[in-house]
């Protein structure tokens, strides 16, 4: 069932929360780097009033639990509860048994590690249907109803919190490196969310479509879809070819097209995740190793 609560998902949400918490304690807090979203607010409260993030994280997220229940349903509520409680638990553990690794002399490295750990942790949590509460839920709702990647929504919200942190306890240098960490995290979240199997999509318009598609099929063993179109100026019906290939085959695809029709119109676009035969399945419909 789509809405079934799975132990596998809960397990990976716990793993993601542990990775996130480790990065936050050992790279953000130790090097006075802020963070965005509700996590950034917990760090702000810690810097100004010495309130433990493990406690303020739970307190701030109580209202969000009700939003999660009403708008995201029972399964999302459970995963959000697990993610939020696990985050606070791991924050408490890592603060209690902290490994001292200060990198104030190299904030660029600290920001990179902070972004990687937080991005990887949140990416895993999101991929398995969970959130850590707060802006994570807002980002998931925006992604669900408007199709905007979660990383972008979070980056915008994060910027607002970081500006507030700059006005209260961050230096300009720390604020700039915090933005670097947030950017790295946002990119990594999108990468993990989209599956990591990126490809290129080519839209081809040519008077020699038959020869082009035949050569693609024979030499590259890639499928080609024929779309129906109409020229804006001539009003003539035309066939438009669409082909998706791995990034490392794009040069070969261009070479095939150019060898038949150097004047062909070719538009190449990014394809963030590809499923199906030739990419995630072999010719016998068995999963390919990724």
From Swiss-Prot:
Keyword terms: Cell membrane, Membrane, Transmembrane, Transmembrane helix
Keyword Heme: no
Record's subcellular location: Cell membrane
Entry GO CC: plasma membrane
Pfam families attached to this UniProt entry: DUF2179, YitT_membrane
Bilayer topology annotation: Multi-pass membrane protein
Principal subcellular localization: membrane
InterPro entries hit by this protein: DUF2179, N-reg_PII/ATP_PRibTrfase_C, UPF0750_membrane, YitT
Transmembrane segment boundaries: 9-29, 47-67, 75-95, 106-126, 146-166, 179-199
Family: Belongs to the UPF0750 family.
PANTHER family, sorted: UPF0750 MEMBRANE PROTEIN YITT-RELATED (PTHR33545), UPF0750 MEMBRANE PROTEIN YPJC (PTHR33545:SF10)
UniProt name for this protein: UPF0750 membrane protein YpjC
Native organism: Bacillus subtilis (strain 168)
């Amino acid at each position: 069932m789509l809405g079934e609560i799975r132990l596998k998902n809960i397990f990976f949400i716990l793993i993601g929360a542990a990775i996130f918490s480790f990065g936050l304690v050992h790279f953000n807090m130790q090097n006075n780097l802020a963070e965005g979203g509700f996590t950034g607010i917990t760090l702000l409260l810690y810097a100004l009033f010495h309130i433990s993030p493990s406690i303020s994280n739970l307190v701030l997220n109580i209202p969000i639990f009700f939003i999660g229940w009403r708008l995201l349903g029972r399964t999302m509520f459970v995963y959000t509860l697990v993610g939020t409680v696990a985050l606070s638990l791991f924050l408490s553990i890592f603060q209690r048994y902290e490994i001292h690794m200060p990198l104030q002399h190299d904030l660029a490295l600290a920001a990179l590690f902070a972004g990687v750990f937080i991005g990887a942790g949140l990416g895993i949590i999101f991929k398995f249907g969970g959130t850590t509460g707060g802006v994570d839920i807002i980002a998931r709702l925006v992604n669900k109803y408007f199709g905007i990647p979660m990383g972008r929504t979070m980056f915008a919200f994060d910027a607002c919190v970081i500006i507030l942190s700059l006005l209260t306890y961050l230096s300009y240098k720390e604020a700039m490196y915090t933005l670097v960490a947030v950017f790295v995290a946002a990119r990594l979240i999108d990468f993990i969310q989209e599956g990591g199997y990126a490809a290129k999509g080519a839209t081809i318009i040519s008077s020699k479509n038959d020869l082009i598609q035949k050569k693609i099929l024979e030499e590259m063993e890639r499928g080609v879809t024929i779309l129906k179109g109409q020229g804006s100026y001539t009003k003539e019906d035309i066939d438009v070819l669409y082909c998706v290939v791995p990034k490392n085959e794009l040069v070969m695809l261009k070479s095939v097209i150019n060898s038949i029709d150097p004047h062909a119109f070719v538009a190449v676009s990014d394809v963030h995740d590809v499923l199906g035969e030739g990419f995630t399945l072999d010719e016998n419909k068995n999963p390919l190793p990724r």
